[in-house]
Amino acid sequence: MIIMNLQIFAHKKGMGSSKNGRDSESKRLGTKSADGQFVLAGNILVRQRGTKIHPGKNVGRGSDDTLFSKIDGIVRYERFGKTKKKASVYPLEVEELVAE
């Protein structure tokens, strides 16, 4: 009886790990308050990178270009110039407060 010492190799190359399968976490950018919506002072209006929307009346701009309301009021998104947009917050009128 003959005893053979065999080592068997794979006849196809093994599959390595994929180079895909990763993604960065979303930053949740965009408008957080709609046009005509009532907001409180300090509420975030828009989260953005760069000044896609510029701050208007009663709106501040954070260090990461986030727009926020400086007063309680109604949000208005307006155009100025040919291509630019701005967000403003206007205080409620006395008649509007009584009607509600």
Curated annotation (Swiss-Prot):
Coiled coil: none annotated. The keyword Ribosomal protein applies. GO terms for cellular component: cytosolic large ribosomal subunit. One of its GO terms (biological process) is translation. GO terms for molecular function: structural constituent of ribosome. The N-terminus is cleaved by ribosomal processing cysteine protease Prp. Keywords: Ribonucleoprotein, Ribosomal protein. InterPro entries: Ribosomal_bL27, Ribosomal_bL27_CS. Residues 1-9 form a propeptide. Residues 13-32 are annotated as: Disordered. Pfam families: Ribosomal_L27. Belongs to the bacterial ribosomal protein bL27 family. HAMAP family: Ribosomal_bL27. This is Large ribosomal subunit protein bL27. It comes from Clostridium kluyveri (strain ATCC 8527 / DSM 555 / NBRC 12016 / NCIMB 10680 / K1). The lineage of its organism: Bacteria, Bacillati, Bacillota, Clostridia, Eubacteriales.
